[in-house]
Every structure is written in C-alpha cells, then in structure tokens.
Swiss-Prot record:
Belongs to the FAD-dependent oxidoreductase 2 family. FRD/SDH subfamily. This is Vinyl phenol reductase. It comes from Lactiplantibacillus plantarum (strain ATCC BAA-793 / NCIMB 8826 / WCFS1) (Lactobacillus plantarum). Coiled coil: none annotated. Its cofactor is FAD.
C-alpha cells in the first residue's frame, strides 16, 4: 500500500501552515501537480493562531487613507536588524504585500480591518476567524479543488538529489505505520515553521536560557525542514532568533497556551507596571512592553523577574481598562472584568507563578526576595509616582502607578516565544542556497525556515510581518517552483 496516490508530483510541499498552504495553492494555480505533507494529524500548525498580516498600500489602507511608505518601512526594518536582514527580500515582500492581501481576499478570506500595535504603524490586517479560518475555510479547500493532494501524519525524511545536487525526489513516512514511499519530484518547498519546539536545536543554535523560555505554539516546529536542507548541502544561516513576546506565566501542569487569552497573563506580563529582579531591584523602564520583543530581551537580562501589582491597579484595569493588550486575544484598553476572578483562582490553586500577601514585606518573603531591598525599591518607585517623574529610567508619567493598596500580588515572569525565524539562506525567489552561495536546484524554503527578514530581534512595530512573509514567501516559492518544473517538463519532452 502506498501513502500518496501517485509516485510522481511536480512539487512536494512540506508543512501546512501559512507558508506551505499558500505555496501549494499558488503552485496549483500555476498548473503544477502538488503533494502537500503535514506531519501532525491536524493542518495549519502555529499559523492557526495568527491574527493578521502586514501590508502596505492595500485596498483596506487606501479606503481609510492610511499612507505608509514602503521604502521607509524597508529602511526602518533593515536598520532595526542591524543590517542582518536582506534589503532585496524586504523590497520584494513590501512591493507584493498589497497583492497578498488581495489574493487572500480572492480566496475567500474576510478582514476585520487594519490597525497598529504599540507605537507602530497601521499595517496589521486582521482577518476574521484568525489563521484557522484563513487556512481551513479558504486556502486549503481552494487548494484541494485544484487537485492538491494532502497527506496528514506524514513526514518527509530525506531528500533525493542528482549528482549535481538537483532535487529528484523525497522519501516520506507514515507516522501511523512507519511505511515509507519515495516520491519523484523536481521541486521541494520546505515550510516547516522553524525549530522553537526542538530543545536540542534551541540550546545549540540560540543564546536563550530554554528553562525560562515558554514556547506558545502548535508544538510541531522541530526544525524538520532545516535538517532536510542542511543534509542536502544547504548553508546554515540566520539562526539564533526567536520571536519573544515579553513576560509569560509558567505553569508546568498546563499546556503553554493555557494563559494566552487570559486577562491575568496580560495584566501580569504585558503592562508597563513595576518589575523587580531577583535582588528586589527595579532594572528597566517597564514601558518596554510596548515592543514585546524588546520586553523579552529585557527580561532575559535578569535571572528572575517579578511583576508587582496592588489591588488598586487591579481595580483600575477592571473598571477603566488595561494599558496594553496582547494582540486580538486581549484588546488594548479592554476592561479586565475577569481579572480578579482569574487571580483568585490561581491563588486558590497555589499556582507556582503567583504570590499574594497583605503587606509588601510579607510578599517579598513569599517571593524569596530580600525584604529590605524590595521595600526600598517600592518606596522609591512610589515617590517617583507622586512626583510624576521616573528619575531612574525615565518612564512615561502616564504609567507611573503607585504600589500602595493591599493586598499585593507578585507574578514570576518567564519569557514567551511564538516561533524561531531563519536557518536557510534564500534568494529573492526563495531558492535555498548551498554553502558556496549557489542555489540548490529545485529546493525552496518559505516562512520561518527562510532567513533574511530579521536580525536578532523581531520588529513588532510593523505587526504581522512574520505571517505576512509566510504567505508571501509561500506564494513566491510556489510560483517559481511551478515555473521551474514546467520548464523541466518541456525539456524532458
């Protein structure tokens, strides 16, 4: 019994997230026969949880008179990356971004609108139903209508190459039966979502303390595409970066995404309120949360970090709304009407990340922090709040909120991460490059497997760039792979 219906396909796409699904559909729209592989039982991966994509000059922005210069974005992003990002890739991505928004609409995707995040521009095109609706209700059905064959619980385990390195096939394996099949193909597109969920790769390829890093993802980003490409002679490039998103609550008894949409997580980890380190000292302007990647970096400068909330600020956020949200999961300015109940439940359950006391001294003791230093830090901070001026780190007076009304709460913050980005060096056609900088004929990479979009820190001021690039690079690789296989077919005949 074979796994796939046929032994030969023009293109094999590995991964069914935004990049892989877009690649398969685009290739099919250009006349290619496509086999789409998903190693899990369910398709979409972490793209299911995405909220919207980046674009400039889209029809939605034009309707709202939102004008964002593509060249200004390019300069800002490349500068932000310390020139580790590829300006050519950004140029192509930007120039095609409005087309990508339109293409998704043409496939049946509906949008809520365009918005900004933090201090950024209004470039975030929020789609209805999140990524799950985009993939499962629009792109995947369209792809299957065009004949794309989808295999779930099936892994690509090795690439086959000619003597000159060109792709000639791929061996696939069933997760259920371990049965294998060799698929003849002239092109393989790798879109496997990075390696965040591979602890060994994270330890070897990044500088993050993985004990404090909490992957909030589908759990399937284990570096499969990178390993396949590296074994085929691809250049290892652009590894080391995870998309951090600030403080996150660690609860080993629950799945990591448990608190993603909770008001307690947003209150504890995403607000510009008081943070103390393992010495009971304040160490940063906490308004860094308005760039969630910078917030993750800041948290990593300390061995431990605790967010300190008093009853007054909890009441304020319940009545007046939060200072900062968490994407569309918890909206900015949203009234935190469930916050107290969520906190009370966590305290009652003795969750390991939360501490409650009626006095600052007792709270410090429960958090195992030096009482005198915690008391001094909070007294100094409260004086800054009274004065309306942060003499240490210059925090905006709007966010100087006193810690004075008991009971008091401490939340130990770890660092959340959505994905890694990078690993394979690619051309502007998303062709994978070998160790000499030459394309491996027939091998493409898209989405998080492809390097060139970032430096060591993700840029959230242009929200949606990661999934936007996934859709764009998936289409880009699918289109060029289809053109290449069509040429090969003409030559062979």
């Amino acid at each position: 019994m074979t796994l796939a219906k046929h032994d030969s396909y023009d293109i094999v796409v590995v991964g069914t997230g935004a990049a892989g699904t877009a690649a398969a559909l685009e290739a099919a729209q250009h006349g290619a026969s496509v086999l789409l592989l998903e190693k899990g039982r369910h398709t979409g991966g972490s793209s299911n949880y995405t909220e919207g994509l980046f674009a400039v000059d889209s029809y939605l922005q034009k309707a709202q008179n939102i004008n964002v210069s593509a060249t200004d974005v390019l300069k800002e992003e490349v500068d932000y990356s310390k020139y580790r990002a590829d300006s050519r890739i950004w140029r192509r991505y930007l120039d095609d971004s409005a087309n990508t928004v339109q293409w998704l609409k043409d496939q049946g995707v509906e949008y809520e609108g365009v918005q900004a995040m933090g201090a950024g521009e209004a470039t975030w095109h929020i789609y209805k139903g999140m990524g799950q609706a985009v993939l499962h209700d629009a792109l995947q059905p369209q792809a299957q209508k065009l004949g794309v064959e989808l295999l779930t619980s099936t892994t690509a385990i090795t690439l086959h190459q000619a003597t000159d390195g060109a792709i000639t096939g791929v061996m696939i394996q069933s997760a259920a039966t371990n049965e294998t099949q060799v698929i003849n193909t002239a092109a393989v597109i790798l879109a496997t979502g990075g390696y965040l969920n591979n602890p060994d790769m994270m330890q070897k390829l990044t500088h993050y303390d993985t004990r404090r890093l909490i992957p909030v993802s589908s759990g399937k980003g284990t570096g499969d595409g990178l390993r396949l490409a590296w074994q085929a002679g691809a250049q290892q490039y652009g590894t080391g970066m995870a998309m951090l998103f600030g403080g996150y609550l660690k609860d080993p008894s629950e799945p990591s995404f448990k608190y993603m949409a909770s008001q307690m997580e947003t209150a504890a980890g995403q607000q510009p309120l008081l943070w103390l380190n393992e010495h009971g000292e304040r160490f940063v302007d906490e308004a860094v949360v308005y760039n969630f990647s910078y917030a993750g970096n800041a948290l990593y400068t300390q061995n431990q970090v605790f967010s300190i909330l008093d009853q007054g600020v909890i009441n304020k956020m319940a009545q007046d709304g939060n200072f900062m949200g968490l994407g569309v999961y918890v909206r900015r300015g949203e009234k935190m009407t469930k916050l107290q109940a969520e906190i009370d439940a966590a305290v009652a359950a003795n969750k390991p990340f939360i501490f409650k006391a009626n006095t600052i001294e007792a709270l410090a003791t429960k958090m195992h922090l030096p009482v005198d230093q915690v008391t001094h830090s909070i007294q100094t901070y409260n004086q800054y709040c009274d004065n309306g001026q942060d003499d240490d780190f210059g925090k905006n007076p709007e966010y100087l909120v006193k810690v004075s009304q008991g009971p008091f709460y401490g939340f130990e913050l770890n660092v959340g991460a959505f994905c890694t980005m990078g690993g394979l060096k690619v051309t502007t056609n998303n062709e994978v490059l070998d160790t000499t900088g030459q394309p491996i004929t027939g091998l493409y990479a898209a989405g998080n497997d492809a390097a060139g979009l970032t430096g060591d820190t993700y840029g959230p001021n242009m929200p949606g760039t990661c999934v936007g690039y996934a859709f764009y690079s998936g289409r880009n690789s699918g289109r060029h792979a289809a053109q290449y296989t069509h040429q090969q077919s003409i030559v062979s005949h």
